[in-house]
């Protein structure tokens, strides 16, 4: 695996105004409110429709080593920034794929939010230990699950008794909020309102610098390899993206055995500026290639990589990440933000009172979905 140099911010994304990026905080490129609701629903339906895979099916995936690499990156982020007893807010939690990671971090309370009803029910099943791919051991923390569009709903109105949270996570999903300025702002407003001062926001999302660079390097409007492709519409034929209109830059993304739906470009330096308006300061941002090369130098994370098997286990399993999968990894970055302010001297003790150790469908809160 060769480490690629970090792409510099694209000049066409430079010098954006800090505050308002257009009238009324709405969308761009013709994306109106009803269309954005429709796009959010399409994304939700796509992920809900994906069935839970058995371990055998998962191991036979054409991108199994990429999935293991992604899990390693998320595990490293959680190990670096979560602490025993932490209260966790997991935005776009999906089917609960990170529950075991949080359990290993010995967190004290977990709230998962996802727009897809099918996914949140699968998350409940996984939490209860009822799937054939999960251990039978119970999780050590109480949990609460909410079915809601976390880029539209005011989550603080529903979670004020659960807050504040010590850590918030949004994995491979925050870019879906950048369809409009209003949704992007609501996403960050939710994080800021629910995190305690000094709390951290960890996440992963597409690296806009890499995606735009790839687009400009290709002759047409589509690029990819044997396991993925990205396609931009003809409205971007000039391959220019004015900094004054950073929202609603849509592309189609297909990844074998994983994703097949519209996504949105997130110019990261503008994301950083927007986050600062919500008292969220950047702590870390690294492209996945840079992240892997840096944290593989630490023995505990190298051992974790061996156990997960993204690069083989160093013993019988000699299979490893393909070049195509490694190229997909280059499309993503990891980030960490911290909420301004001094953390409280004493941890609030009653966050977890609303959680349960066993969940039924009646326990799932549905907020306007």
Swiss-Prot record:
Keywords carried by this UniProt record: Methyltransferase, mRNA capping, mRNA processing, Nucleus, RNA-binding, S-adenosyl-L-methionine, Transferase
Compositional bias segments (type: Basic and acidic residues): 33-48
Region (Disordered): 1-55
Documented EC number(s): 2.1.1.56
Record domain mRNA cap 0 methyltransferase: where: 61-340
SUPFAM superfamilies: S-adenosyl-L-methionine-dependent methyltransferases
Binding sites annotated in the UniProt record for mRNA: 70-71
Gly residues biased stretches: 22-32
GO CC field: nucleus
Catalytic activity line of the entry: a 5'-end (5'-triphosphoguanosine)-ribonucleoside in mRNA + S-adenosyl-L-methionine = a 5'-end (N(7)-methyl 5'-triphosphoguanosine)-ribonucleoside in mRNA + S-adenosyl-L-homocysteine
GO molecular function: mRNA 5'-cap (guanine-N7-)-methyltransferase activity; RNA binding
InterPro entries: mRNA_G-N7_MeTrfase_dom, mRNA_G-N7_MeTrfase_euk, RG7MT1, SAM-dependent_MTases_sf
Matching CDD domains: AdoMet_MTases
Location in the cell: Nucleus
Site-annotated residues for mRNA cap binding: 95, 101, 126, 175, 263, 332
Binding residue positions for S-adenosyl-L-methionine: 74, 92, 114, 149-150, 171-173
GO biological process: 7-methylguanosine mRNA capping
Broad class of enzyme this protein falls into: transferase
Function: mRNA-capping methyltransferase that methylates the N7 position of the added guanosine to the 5'-cap structure of mRNAs. Binds RNA containing 5'-terminal GpppC.
Assigned protein family: Belongs to the class I-like SAM-binding methyltransferase superfamily. mRNA cap 0 methyltransferase family.
Protein name: mRNA cap guanine-N(7) methyltransferase 1
